[in-house]
Amino acid sequence: GYNALGSYSVGAGSIEFDFSSPDGNLEGKLASENSNVSSSLTQNGLLFDAYFANGLFKLSSSVMPIPVDISLKNGNYGFTVPILKQMQSQNFGLRLGFSDLQIAQDLWELLDPNNNLKNGPINAKIAFSGKAKLLENLIELRPDIYEDNNLNPIPFEVDEMFLEKLDLSLMGTSLQGEGSVSLDNEDLTTFAGFPKPVGSFEFVLSGVNGLVDKLISSGFI
């Protein structure tokens, strides 16, 4: 067996770039106050998580009418991936989120010149996980693996999927969701070649009527 763990933290930092060509110029900036990254690699798979605070993204070009200027309070992303072949189900997952994402007013007015839509902070969080059987070792990048697996780029068989959390809010609306399904990989006839799902997802959407009215008045609909 083997076990590798790692983590690091970075203080305030930024990346700036500036490109020029006969067609115009492009310049931008990526920055954050601090970030943290952790990872582990074991027989149970690869786990990776990253977090950053007070992020900033700017992009301008001679061919863009308005510069892109976006900031957010914090963000995170991560994943869990099995890497070794096993006949029993293994965990996989994906995690994404950010809070207080703000689009600069100049850019927002380009999208909504009449100011009918609320340019407030955008928040999002999603956590998705599941269980799957890995039919080949992912660390063995052999072309015949994919040929033997009907050209499936990743030879795996999903048994269960869980939407642990979905939380999205923007422009006065919100969407929450959760749920799970089990997949019957023996039944490929009910859904024409796809495993039969058994389970359900539940979603709650609020504030959408007011948003639709504003989209209509803005000419988007």
Task: Describe every region a protein language model picked out.
Residues 1-221:
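Glycine-rich, small/hydroxylated-residue low-complexity segments
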